[in-house]
């Protein structure tokens, strides 16, 4: 094969690989998003002070989703985050929020990679991932220590395949060995893909925030801690 023919052959392979990889992606899909939905009302309009107990930027993302949902909740008049609440802010409740997320892959991803690549399973099904979120909520009266943390679990079942994973999984079609390389690639595909997290967060943002916000309002109804009028408003440090 002369030089020009070799260049043309390599260019064709590169084009095929890029086209196949880009076509074999699967948009983020949260299969059980509908499971985490609840509606609630409160007998009065609440004012809530939030204490951010997140310990990482990722946890803070989920905390912000909760804050956003409370800010538009029909049972909440006002919500502020400590210690930035105004000195004259007198909340009905103080709620400490600590979200924790655990992301996991699945051994099913091995079989999606091989022999699944033959049917482009990674494109029409996506790889299988889980995101187990546990949000710890502690309710208290202003000026008192928070009560015991109450965990709220939201375990999400998702499907996703980005360009990178689609490219390597599809490589079984254009690499030597009739997909033998996929037998090795499959082990790498088993683990969770961190690149899926931003798309997952965007998809659950509204539903997760609303679910936790409703859980907080339910806590105030189930175990009401009526604000003592003698308690001074929270200062900038709570």
Give residue spans per PLM region:
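Short, solvent-exposed, polar/charged sequence segments at loop or secondary-structure edges
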Residues: 64-116
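Extracytoplasmic/periplasmic, Sec-exported soluble proteins
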Residues: 54-58, 62, 125-129, 192, ...
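Ser/Thr- (and often Asn-) enriched beta-sheet segments in non-cytosolic proteins
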Residues: 29, 45-49, 78-80, 90-98, ...
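Sec-dependent bacterial lipoprotein signal peptides
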Residues: 1-24
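Lipid-handling modules and contact-site tethers
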Residues: 167-210
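A structural "domain/chain start" motif
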Residues: 23-87, 186-194, 214-238
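Extended amphipathic secondary-structure runs
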Residues: 140-153, 198-237
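Surface-exposed short loop/turn segments
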Residues: 94-149, 156-174
């Amino acid at each position: 094969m002369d030089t020009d023919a070799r260049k043309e052959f390599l260019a064709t392979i590169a084009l095929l690989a890029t086209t196949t990889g880009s076509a074999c992606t699967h948009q983020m899909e949260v299969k059980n998003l509908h499971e985490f939905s609840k509606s609630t009302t409160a007998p009065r309009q609440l004012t809530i002070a939030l204490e951010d107990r997140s310990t990482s930027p990722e946890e803070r993302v989920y905390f912000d989703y909760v804050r956003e949902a409370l800010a538009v909740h029909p049972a909440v008049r006002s919500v502020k985050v400590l210690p930035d609440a105004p000195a004259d802010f007198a909340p009905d409740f103080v709620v400490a929020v600590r979200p924790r997320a655990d992301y996991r892959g699945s051994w099913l991803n091995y079989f999606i990679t091989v022999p699944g690549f033959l049917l482009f399973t990674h494109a029409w099904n996506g790889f299988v991932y889980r995101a187990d979120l546990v949000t710890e909520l502690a309710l208290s009266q202003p000026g008192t220590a928070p009560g015991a943390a109450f965990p709220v679990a939201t375990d999400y079942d998702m499907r996703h395949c980005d360009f990178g994973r689609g490219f390597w999984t599809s490589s079984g079609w254009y690499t030597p060995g009739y997909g033998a390389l996929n037998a090795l690639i499959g082990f790498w595909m088993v683990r969770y893909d961190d690149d899926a997290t931003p798309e997952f967060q965007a998809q659950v943002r509204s539903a997760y925030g609303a679910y936790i916000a409703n859980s907080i309002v339910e806590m105030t109804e189930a175990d009401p801690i009526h604000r003592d009028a003698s308690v001074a408003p929270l200062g900038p440090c709570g």
